[in-house]
Amino acid sequence: MLLSRAYDDVVVGSGINGLACAALLARSGRHVCVLERNDWFGGAIKTDEITEPGFRHDVFSAWHPLWVGGQAHAQLGADLARHGLDYLNTDLPTGTLYPDGESAFLLRTADENAAELDRHHADDGDAWRAMLGEFFPNADLAFGILGTELWSRQGAGLGVKAVRRLGRQGAAEFAGRLLISARDWLETAFGSERTHGLLAPWVLHTGLGPDAAASGYMAQVIAVAVQEGGMPIPRGGGQKLADALVALIRENGGTCETSVHVDRVFSGGVRTADGETVSATEVICNVTPTQLYGELLEGYEDKAKGFRYGRSEMQIHYALSEPPRWEADERLARTAIVHLTPGLDGVSRAVNEADRGLLPAEATVVVGQPLTMDESRAPEGKGLLWIQLQELPWRIKGDAAGEFDIGAGEWTEELRERYAERIQSRLTRHIPNLESSILARTALSPADLQAANINLHQGDPYGGSLALDQNFLWRPLGSQPGHRTPVPGVWHVGASTHPGPGLGGGSGALVAQQLLKPSLAERARGRLLR
């Protein structure tokens, strides 16, 4: 039997939330241990040469606006910079390319965006300014929902602040607007379908579809965040963020270990698969509810049986002999993320097809171009593309285009490559030199993603469905919302918990904040000593 080790905090899983939490705790003087089952730190953050030597791909997640704009980075950013984290940014964060070759872009200032939207509809620029005029005075409330432990005194205080500022009727109206769908917001606010198609794909990055409740709120939050913060990425790849966090934890006396499989969590510590017990006052689990309640905590197997996962995704990575030459607007070649879609209805249709178990006939294609900011990702003169498809089923019932025999309805290598060919043929219509410049292509199906990272359950990168009953106040479970678990001293963080998915570290920061908050006894003692 291995000897037991003891820490203040053990973090199970080194995703962005686990690492952010551990770094905040370690920097505050607590003795922290991070245990990761994979052979790399970072969870869905991984940079690797998976196509050709010299081409450094962000294998899963790639874009860091939520992190750079979040509270964890605000507290840790200077220290992480000392450990080699250097962010690059762009004035062309995103755009949408339509089948007819027309395009629309989201830029970095209100005036630029108003002018861009006016190209498509004479009143859309004014509508954009009006949206900003309504959003910014209450931005602390809008962003506060995503940066507050909702089941807490601070969460209640957010509601009190809204009532005091807006009045009861105004606060009720504000809360109601948070639940509007992206379709209803876009079609009410803007006259051009080009504007609708520019903003609608972004709700996919939150795990929602454009007809889902609260997708309008999330679309506005992302639109404002992109305008104000751009699309930052770390020089050298996303792995630089994970590496810097690990270095900071170790600098402050913490321990970080890979290839350690934790198979049991309990009040007071964890047990590893090789029989070691690691004791801790607090255990923070960066896992899904399926893992936490179905495997790690004994006696709670039924608790997460009703938890639902969302749509699956697929990644495609290209190493190219030359940069992609986009047709139409020259700005496309300089844009960090380009969405290929027919527009709002196209996104809605693809989401609906995936929800019904069909391979979408015309999926939204997310084309990431990290070389627009970071030339170190590929050899000089070469090209690199990061492709994400967010509207896919886990269990496949059919093909909406009627082209594929889906066999037993599972993701096979053959089906993965055939679907990648469908996407590639669409890309080639807009990038004529694509096929002639391909050095290598690596595709990862939902099954591949789940095999690579247990938290990508069923290929869902967003930690579970974000339907209203599994979102905000009810995330991850209506019976167990927030970050506490039924077991004292065991906490739950990650995309499956509030504030949900995205590379931001929000849930990790919220749990660290609670653990570092003085206890009632400490606060009382402090008042007596004044």
Outline where the language-model segments fall.
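Extreme N-terminal leader/targeting segments of oxidoreductases
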Residues: 1-9, 27-28, 471-478, 520-530
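N-terminal glycine-rich phosphate/pyrophosphate-binding loop and immediately adjacent elements
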Residues: 2-147, 463-465
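Rossmann-like flavin
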Residues: 99-213
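Flavin-binding catalytic cores
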Residues: 121-124, 323-324, 356-360, 380-381, ...
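A glycine-rich dinucleotide-binding beta-alpha-beta segment and adjacent secondary-structure elements
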Residues: 192-211, 360-368, 424, 429-498
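Helical element adjacent to the flavin cofactor pocket in flavoenzyme catalytic cores
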Residues: 221-268
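Mid-domain catalytic core of redox enzymes
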Residues: 263-379
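A conserved FAD-binding loop/helix module that cradles the flavin
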Residues: 495-516
